[in-house]
């Protein structure tokens, strides 16, 4: 999805574009531990990867799920994240409070994947290309479709990761809410320069 932006940035920046835990080529741990896909855990993954690649401090940008991870990294690792960009996502607490009435239909997948294990995995797993393809279609925003080989690779990666993708979204309705509520009540703030870009749904 971000291949062109990454290539442009790489002309004069070091660019690291990892698949988040549970997505693409990254590990997909399974189990009942609610912290497996907590954004706190995933943020620690990103920081550990950057450090392993020799970057003790870095600017961080994330889109959608990646923005939730980036936001958490900024809160948990303010000594590491020097600048932060969050694109196209509401903070976790707001994500559950802002959508109302029929306008919430755009986020139907959030509510589906918030359910306990079983039903979401079965429903999405029964037609993963239709489910994930729906989002590719509505997120495209352009009349020319995504190249067929890119679409096929994206769908194949999602098809093989249904349980971990659902676990990531489920964490956003459980443990991530707890973490963010504690931080909000404690008055935690992002101390680095922050850019937020949100499209109009």
Please name every model-derived segment.
Residues 7-9, 188:
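A generic structural signal for short, solvent-exposed coil/turn residues
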């Amino acid at each position: 999805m971000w291949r062109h932006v990454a290539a442009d940035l790489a002309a004069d920046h070091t660019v690291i574009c990892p698949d988040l835990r549970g997505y693409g080529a990254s590990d997909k741990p399974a189990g009942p531990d609610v912290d497996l896909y907590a954004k706190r855990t995933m943020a620690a993954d990103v920081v550990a990867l950057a450090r392993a690649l020799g970057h003790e401090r870095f600017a961080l940008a994330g889109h959608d799920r990646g923005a939730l991870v980036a936001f958490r990294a900024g809160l948990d690792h303010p000594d590491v994240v020097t600048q932060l960009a969050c694109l196209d996502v509401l903070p976790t607490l707001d994500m559950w409070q802002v959508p109302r009435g029929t306008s919430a239909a755009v986020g139907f997948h959030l509510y589906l994947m918030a359910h306990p294990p079983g039903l979401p995995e079965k429903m999405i797993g029964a037609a993963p290309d239709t489910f994930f393809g729906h989002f590719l279609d509505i997120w495209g925003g352009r009349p020319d479709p995504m190249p067929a080989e890119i679409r096929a690779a994206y769908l194949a990666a999602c098809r093989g990761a249904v349980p971990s993708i659902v676990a990531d979204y489920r964490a956003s309705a459980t443990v991530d809410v707890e973490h963010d509520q504690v931080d909000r009540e404690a008055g935690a703030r992002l101390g680095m320069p922050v850019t937020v870009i949100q499209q109009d749904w």
